[in-house]
From Swiss-Prot:
Pfam families: HrcA. Negative regulator of class I heat shock genes (grpE-dnaK-dnaJ and groELS operons). Prevents heat-shock induction of these operons. Keywords: Repressor, Stress response, Transcription, Transcription regulation. This is Heat-inducible transcription repressor HrcA. The lineage of its organism: Bacteria, Bacillati, Actinomycetota, Actinomycetes, Mycobacteriales.
Amino acid sequence: MGTADERRFEVLRAIVADFVATHEPIGSKSLVERHNLGVSSATIRNDMAVLEAEGYIAQPHTSSGRVPTEKGYREFVDRLDDVKPLSMVERRAIQGFLESGVDLDDVLRRAVRLLAQLTRQVAVVQYPTLSTSKVRHLEVIALTPARLLMVVITDSGRVDQRIVELGDVIDDHQLSQLRELLGQALEGKKLAAASVAVADLAGQLSGAGGLGDAVGRSATVLLESLVEHTEERLLMGGTANLTRNAADFGGSLRSILEALEEQVVVLRLLAAQQEAGKVTVRIGHETEAEQIVGTSMVSTAYGSNDTVYGGMGVLGPTRMDYPGTIASVAAVALYIGEVLGAR
């Protein structure tokens, strides 16, 4: 790329940085004063004219300054040479804060609150998707000789507890057999495979009396846990940050809030995240969602040991601190995966 093109990109980068910081249209005079671009104000005006003609910046109303367009933000993001990671102190603080979570729900609540504070945007975290989860452990506890508590724990930290009402009482030996049979059928399998295995086990022992009946009743309850409750869940934090940036959205703030409440659009965008460590930036119309027009979404996947648990990210105006947001999203995702993977 030629020298003139490189210089124009430096002008574009300066316009993006100043507009994000000030929310005021940027003129050539302020660029000369704030940035060491090494050229005259007249040259910068010419460069801005070219950038405007090519669609990277625009003139709002009658202002003498210019603001970045979606195309301009995309060029800026695509040419980020290196996103500066958070400092060691910041990363240790994030890790310690997340490690203090007592369970999956607490870890994710902490993550979404932390990400909203770091970026000053709306933070969203998808609960671990059931399609990728495996059964880590099944515990069977006798509450009474005819009532059992089933506890299913997945590798992503989900814990589901179910009560099984037995037709007949079972003794300690039968309880031990039941625990072993169900554990062998379920543990280490993805939920879809585990549901098939437990159904097969129930079929094999159908009509076998006491233990067979207990397996059948347990299987019915476990299938509810493994299959029937697969709705996606989303945690959200920092929605008040939208009102702080209300001017950026024009008249679309209401539709954005409605989209966040309905969750469908955000879940679709997060579901596209299939690679932990890879941050995706969607700017404006790249979200392909009319309800959140005027926003950008920075998202990634989180997981552990090559297993993706779910997606997470932030939603905010196109006038966003992209380098800082990318670094924050990447760091929080990394530590969520580490914390959940260690449990």
